[in-house]
Amino acid sequence: GVPCRCDSDGPSVHGNTLSGTIWVGSCETGWHKCNTEHNLFHECCKQ
């Protein structure tokens, strides 16, 4: 999947590890949304 930034990754500066994965729609079962950003068509999710 496409990596995305979770709140726990810290501020989005170059070089940070992106620990989330973008899911279209909402997060897969067993995953949870890991940031506070509001996106219309996808969520940044983490297992």
Curated annotation (Swiss-Prot):
Keywords: Disulfide bond, Hydroxylation, Ion channel impairing toxin, Nematocyst, Neurotoxin, Secreted, Toxin, Voltage-gated sodium channel impairing toxin. The keyword Phosphoprotein does not apply. It is found in: Secreted; Nematocyst. Pfam families: Toxin_4. Disulfide bonds join C4-C44, C6-C34, C27-C45. It comes from the Eukaryota. GO terms for cellular component: extracellular region; nematocyst. The modification Hydroxyproline is found at P3. One of its GO terms (molecular function) is sodium channel regulator activity. SUPFAM superfamilies: Defensin-like (SSF57392). A synonymy between H.magnifica and R.crispa is controversial. Belongs to the sea anemone sodium channel inhibitory toxin family. Type I subfamily. Inhibits voltage-gated sodium channels (Nav). This is Delta-stichotoxin-Hcr3a. It comes from Radianthus crispa (Leathery sea anemone). The lineage of its organism: Eukaryota, Metazoa, Cnidaria, Anthozoa, Hexacorallia.
